[in-house]
From Swiss-Prot:
InterPro entries: Aminoacid_DH-like_N_sf, Glu/Leu/Phe/Val/Trp_DH, Glu/Leu/Phe/Val/Trp_DH_C, Glu/Leu/Phe/Val/Trp_DH_dimer, Glu/Leu/Phe/Val_DH_AS, Glu_DH, NAD(P)-bd_dom_sf, NAD_bind_Glu_DH. It catalyses: L-glutamate + NAD(+) + H2O = 2-oxoglutarate + NH4(+) + NADH + H(+); L-glutamate + NADP(+) + H2O = 2-oxoglutarate + NH4(+) + NADPH + H(+). It is an enzyme of class 1 (oxidoreductase). SUPFAM superfamilies: Aminoacid dehydrogenase-like, N-terminal domain, NAD(P)-binding Rossmann-fold domains. GO terms for biological process: amino acid metabolic process. Belongs to the Glu/Leu/Phe/Val dehydrogenases family. Its EC number is 1.4.1.3. This is Glutamate dehydrogenase. It comes from Vitis vinifera. The lineage of its organism: Eukaryota, Viridiplantae, Streptophyta, Embryophyta, Tracheophyta.
Length: 411
């Protein structure tokens, strides 16, 4: 089951729990707007190349639409649609005043020079500038994009609309970015993990962790868990996997990856088959990479009691069912990885106010939002006798449905 089908399934289940009528359910499911554009740019060698870009604006009942822009060869309308819808529920779960959107361009960033990436970004912005905006749709970085990409979008957009720092988030600090944004998704994952463990009478200290993915999110998760006394016994990324039952030294591992570009040949651990990482014995498993990694083929062999979905859609519905029957506790992606969009909201607020927060304030506010959201999810679970995933979806769908009804849009 692909990401769109799984997201729709979760939404419909939440709708049934809430007793939404079919007309309202349909209006919440259909995207507000789907945009497809062709972006033709001159390459460095003088040839022309055309790339297809997408922006799906799913819902704006609770506020401006919010979501990343990814540059990846496998970007397609279904994936963008699913991720846009997921952003609607994600922003609603943590109760920030946004709806959901997502965008992307089908390209391979590593095959493009910096100047080609800049031209592509500016052309894409020219095509969609009148459909995004501070109070309309606010993009952010995603897979294959970064703060520099946002700087180009900001600059190109400002040519048409004047200086508009709040039109994108995840910007460089010098252009209005927020302190704490780089670590925000990973830090949010850790705050979410702490909230879940506390509910089970546990803490991070002394537990064993396995982390799949060691990019921005995974590396920050590892660093922050290590600081709290957690024992990270295995880590993987696209270059390989490394384990140490006594605990990996994350500072050394980060230094090794920075120097070599990979996890392999790390002296502080042993090589392991990346395919065995997800089923490695541990207390807490944190997938931080791609979707669909936990499926019906490997779910029965997963040994972790707690699974924290730092990636988007890492668990197939079939795996979800298998893991739940085994007594596994899954913290769903629409909550667990919402730290990034929450601090994006803080950045947007700072830009509108023209007043920058200290990093300590950013982190403290993030902890408040993540902790409060967890307690709201648990309350939904208790009210409807459902899983954490359905508690999160039910909470989110109910908030969006209420806003939609109050606006009179459901008819």
């Amino acid at each position: 089951m692909n990401a769109l089908a799984a997201t729709n399934r979760n939404f419909r289940h939440a709708s049934r729990i809430l007793g939404l009528d079919s007309k309202l359910e349909k209006s919440l499911l259909i995207p507000f707007r789907e945009i497809k554009v062709e972006c033709t740019i001159p390459k460095d060698d003088g040839s022309l190349a055309t790339y297809v870009g997408f922006r799906v604006q799913h819902d704006n009942a609770r506020g401006p639409m919010k979501g990343g822009i990814r540059y990846h060869p496998e970007v397609d309308p279904d994936e963008v649609n699913a991720l846009a819808q997921l952003m609607t529920w994600k922003t609603a779960v943590v109760d920030i005043p946004y709806g959901g959107a997502k965008g992307g361009i089908g390209c391979t960033p590593k095959d493009l020079s910096m100047s080609e990436l800049e031209r592509l970004t500016r052309v894409f912005t020219q095509k969609i500038h009148d459909l995004i905006g501070t109070h309309t749709d606010v993009p952010a970085p995603d897979m294959g994009t970064n703060a520099q990409t946002m700087a180009w979008i900001l600059d190109e957009y400002s040519k048409f609309h004047g200086h508009s720092p709040a039109v994108v988030t995840g910007k460089p600090i010098a252009l209005g970015g927020s302190l704490g944004r780089e670590a925000a998704t990973g830090r949010g994952v850790v705050f979410a993990t702490e909230a879940l463990l506390a509910q089970h009478g546990k803490s991070i200290k002394g537990l064993t962790f396995v982390i799949q993915g060691f990019g921005n999110v995974g590396s920050w998760v590892a660093r922050l868990i290590g600081e709290r006394g957690g024992k990270i016994i295995a880590v993987s990324d696209v270059t390989g996997a490394v384990k140490n039952q006594n605990g990996l030294d994350i500072v050394d591992l980060l230094r090794h990856k920075e120097e070599t570009g990979c996890l392999t040949n790390f002296s502080g651990g042993d090589h392991m088959d990346p395919n065995e990482l997800l089923t490695h014995e541990c207390d807490v498993l944190i997938p931080c990479a791609l979707g669909g990694v936990l499926n019906k083929e490997n779910a029965a062999d997963v040994k972790a009691k707690f699974i924290i979905e730092a990636a988007n859609h890492p668990t197939d519905p079939e795996a979800d069912e298998i893991l739940s029957k085994k007594g596994g506790v899954i913290l769903p992606d629409i909550y667990a990885n919402a730290g990034g969009v929450t601090v994006s909201y803080f950045e947007w607020v700072q830009n509108i106010q023209g007043f920058m927060w200290e990093e300590e304030k950013v982190n403290n506010e993030l902890q408040k939002y993540m902790t409060k959201a967890f307690h709201n999810i648990k309350a939904m679970c208790q009210s409807h006798n459902c899983s954490l995933r359905m508690g999160a979806f039910t909470l989110a769908v109910n908030r969006v449905a209420c806003a939609t009804t109050l606006r009179g849009w459901e008819a």
